[in-house]
Amino acid sequence: MATQRASGLLQRLAQGSLVKQILVGLVLGILLAWISKPAAEAVGLLGTLFVGALKAVAPVLVLMLVMASIANHQHGQKTNIRPILFLYLLGTFSAALAAVVFSFAFPSTLHLSSSAQDIVPPSGIVEVLRGLLMSMVSNPIDALLNANYIGILVWAVGLGFALRHGNETTKNLVNDMSNAVTFMVKLVIRFAPVGIFGLVSSTLATTGFSTLWGYAHLLVVLIGCMLLVALVVNPLLVFWKIRRNPYPLVFACLRESGVYAFFTRSSAANIPVNMALCEKLNLDRDTYSVSIPLGATINMAGAAITITVLTLAAVHTLGVPVDLPTALLLSVVASLCACGASGVAGGSLLLIPLACNMFGIPNDIAMQVVAVGFIIGVLQDSCETALNSSTDVLFTAAACQAEDERLANNALRS
């Protein structure tokens, strides 16, 4: 009897709402950090294991899914990568533009006294682009080991096209391997409530939020701008694409992708979550198996906001005059930098000196701005990743649904 009850409880847990279970894990994590700091730090291992498992499975998932998708692609079957890529770039530029408007409407100032040492930012936008190109010709084993998604995509696409000329049994084997990896991903995702419990507990216990109060205004501007993009700008772009109420799709992506990304703080770790959501939304597998890992690499609206807001905060602090053309140029530079953020160790923060260079701000001061970014990183990085990752699914879904509707309308006319 006891065994039956235990198995029944496990079955209910396995089949229950994952979002509700995550909320329970979140509340329990906050309570544990409040009750016992040492215990909260100890259970941080659960969060580390969860994020590690996601990061471990994500590169293999991308390689197998893209390879299987291209190898089994039927001649004449259309994918929607081009419109999704356009949405990615337009969304990133719109986010940078919104950040410029926000920064001028609510100017922030910084206390530039600390220094960031042992950090070497890229010397220019050319170096960022060069880094991306070098990532494309990486050794496949090295790309898998270091989670270099540009390199993984290049090898997966190349092998996929090569396997189109292979035997059907070979294609079936690749497809079966892809399904096996997908099963492993679903298994890892079921442990999300436990992982988030550990992440929340350890974060609150080790960092707390007392150090953030000194940068409250800057955080309000940053997070407010990200909310504006998530709840106004992105829905407008989606409405332009699907011509109906975008908010059910927007909230679904924020709830089922953004929540995970907020706590894992890793676009790469969130790739399996986004893949699972795309499958749940019944999107075209040939499309999302390419667009999701591509989005994790170049769709960086949150990074564009971070670069723009922190750069203009430094500009306002130093009293550097900024005219409209320069502000627009900053939006373009921030967008280009953001698209290369995944190829730079330290991400968006280490690309701030590039943007600061536009205004003649010395590198030592720019690195102090980077140091401020690391201080507020607990919230800034979480919100940035949540926006970046949820937007990957949102734009993929919008493009796929728009294409499905177009095909349905054409069928009705004929």
From Swiss-Prot:
Task: Please provide the record's keywords in A-Z order.
Answer: Amino-acid transport, Cell inner membrane, Cell membrane, Membrane, Symport, Transmembrane, Transmembrane helix, Transport
Do you know which SUPFAM superfamilies this protein is assigned to?
Answer: Proton glutamate symport protein
TM helices/strands, residue ranges: 16-36, 46-66, 84-104, 143-163, 180-200, 219-239, 300-320, 332-352
MF (Gene Ontology): neutral L-amino acid:sodium symporter activity
Q: List the GO terms this entry assigns under cellular component, sorted alphabetically.
A: plasma membrane
* Catalysed reactions listed for this entry: L-serine(in) + Na(+)(in) = L-serine(out) + Na(+)(out); L-threonine(in) + Na(+)(in) = L-threonine(out) + Na(+)(out)
Q: What is this protein called?
A: Serine/threonine transporter SstT
Q: Which organism is it from?
A: Salmonella typhimurium (strain LT2 / SGSC1412 / ATCC 700720)
